[in-house]
Structure formats: structure tokens, C-alpha cells
Amino acid sequence: MPDRGGENGASCSVGRWSAEEARAIYNLPFNDLLFRAHGLHRENFDPNRIQLSKLLNIKTGGCPEDCGYCSQSASAENGLKASKLMEIETVLEEARKAKAAGATRYCMGAAWRSPKDRDMPALTHMIESVKAMGLETCMTLGMLDSDKAEKLADAGLDYYNHNIDTSERFYPAVITTRSFEDRLDTLANVRNAGIKVCSGGILGLGEETEDRIDMLVTLANLPEPPESVPINMLIPMPGTRLAKAAPVDPLEFVRVVALARILMPKSHVRLTAGRTAMSDEMQALCFFAGANSLFMGDTLLTAANPGDDRDSSLLRRLGIQAETEQPA
């Protein structure tokens, strides 16, 4: 099978990867798959450095979307109360703490279908102020039209996160209030505004292996692949439609990380939700397969996260350093 990574693992162009090609790679013997993924990882990144990111929930709950996995959906039966948009100084204080703890990327998330005009001045102020601290900025605010994307770009936003979640085929089983095409439209608006794209998906929604492969093929075959690809493992949240979802096989999760690295060799592949359920050994395999970013802290939106102490211990044992640290 030819190595479709291109010269030095260059990213693929439109339509480059077929589902059949991706499936053949995914189904390689496990060691062969990881060997290929790790080789591309080394060509494009330092395998012993990782980016630490911090995610802050700047507006919690009350989202009108019906995403079956999300505790912040208004349809979730969990008693979560909607909050107002966080005060700017509180956001900045949390950003200072994140930077002091080693984060180089700061993501701000709001539980909205899309941001309203009245919220844009506060959002742009947050972006400008966080960037002034020397942090890379990211926001995830729901759908964006071209005008709002331009406003965020003008404020200096580095990344916008908007996951496609799963394959187009399986998507309607998870969400009915916004279409798969709506998500792709937002990604196009973000890209056209000159903001880098952060988009990935969630494993454990009830999807098949084919859906996981197709999700990654969709992302890899965008006009420009996302610079950032978060791979989430579902945390079943009480009160959501997927509260009793079956767990994901750990080795299948690692395979998805490896496939993401192969299809999008120049992208940051981010281990995001679900790490509290992952063993240290599973996370180590993910890093070997090409994951090179994680979210620090005790919480991730409304879900638990391993916390800085466990992460520091794991990275130290693996000899992996944060991007802000000086090599030993």
C-alpha cells in the first residue's frame, strides 16, 4: 500500500482519501498501523512534546440544541441551570491561572446554538485580552455566520472549534436540531474568515466503525484539513439520551487516533473528553499513535477531567514535556 502522506507527510487535497483507502489503513494489524502513524508523527512533530490547553465554560446550560450526548442541552433532564455569559475579568483571571500552569492554548466555550449580536463585544474583548497574555485563543460558540466569523477574526481569534461529531450517515441519530451541512457551513465560514479550524468528533455515540472512519475522511477531505482535530470518548452524562451508552473499546479508540494522524499528518490531534476513563497505558498508546495535545484541569465543560497532578505524573513517566518547558 503506498504511503499517501505526501512529501514530508503533507496534508491531502480535496477528495484525496476515499473511505476504502481509510478503511484499509484502519484495519492494518495494530502494530503496523501504529508504526505508520508514529512515523508520520515524527516527520511533523516532536514526539516528546505536547501542547497543554485549557477549556473554560464561559456560559453554561440552556442550549436549545438536542445533542444526545450533551448535559448542557435544554432537553437533558439533569436540573442544570442556564448561566449568563461569564464576566470578562473572571475569564481573564482563569486565563492567567492556565498560563501559569503551563497552558499555551486557551479555549472558551458557550452553550449556545449561535452567539447573539449583543454578546459579540464581550467575546471580542475576551479574545483580545487573552491574546495579550501570549496565549493562543480558541472559541466554541455554536454555529457562526460569515459576519460573526469575520468579527471574531478581526479580534484576532486563532482557532474556532466546531465538531462534526460523527459521520453524516449516523448524525441524525444523535442530533436533529442542526444538520450535518449546518456544521460544514460553519467550518467554511470560519475558514473563509481566516481563522484556523478545530473540528473532530466523539466516539461511543452508538456509531459503527465505518462511521468513525467516514468522520475522519470528511475532515481530511475538507478544502483544507482542520489544523486541530479533537478526538473525544463519550462521557455518558446523567439525564442525556446517551446516559447508558456502551463504552468504547480502548484499542479501537487508539486506532481512530492513529488514523487521524495518518489522514491529517500536520494537524494537532487532541485527546479531549473521556480521559478519566482511560488508563495511563491507553493514553500512552494514543500519544505514540499521534495525539499531541490534551486539556488540563479537573473539569472539561461539565464533565470530569484527570487533573493536573495525574497528567504531570503521566507525562513525566513517559518523558513527554509540555511545549512551554525547556528540553531536559
Swiss-Prot record:
Its cofactor is [4Fe-4S] cluster; [2Fe-2S] cluster. The keyword tRNA processing does not apply. InterPro entries: Aldolase_TIM, BATS_dom, Biotin_synth/BioAB, Biotin_synthase, Elp3/MiaA/NifB-like_rSAM, rSAM. Pfam families: BATS, Radical_SAM. Its EC number is 2.8.1.6. The keyword DNA damage does not apply. Residues 48-275 form the Radical SAM core domain. It catalyses: (4R,5S)-dethiobiotin + (sulfur carrier)-SH + 2 reduced [2Fe-2S]-[ferredoxin] + 2 S-adenosyl-L-methionine = (sulfur carrier)-H + biotin + 2 5'-deoxyadenosine + 2 L-methionine + 2 oxidized [2Fe-2S]-[ferredoxin]. One of its GO terms (molecular function) is 4 iron, 4 sulfur cluster binding. Transmembrane segments: none annotated. Keywords: 2Fe-2S, 4Fe-4S, Biotin biosynthesis, Iron, Iron-sulfur, Metal-binding, S-adenosyl-L-methionine, Transferase. Pathway: Cofactor biosynthesis; biotin biosynthesis; biotin from 7,8-diaminononanoate: step 2/2. [4Fe-4S] cluster binds at residues 63, 67, 70. Belongs to the radical SAM superfamily. Biotin synthase family. Catalyzes the conversion of dethiobiotin (DTB) to biotin by the insertion of a sulfur atom into dethiobiotin via a radical-based mechanism. This is Biotin synthase. It comes from Brucella ovis (strain ATCC 25840 / 63/290 / NCTC 10512).
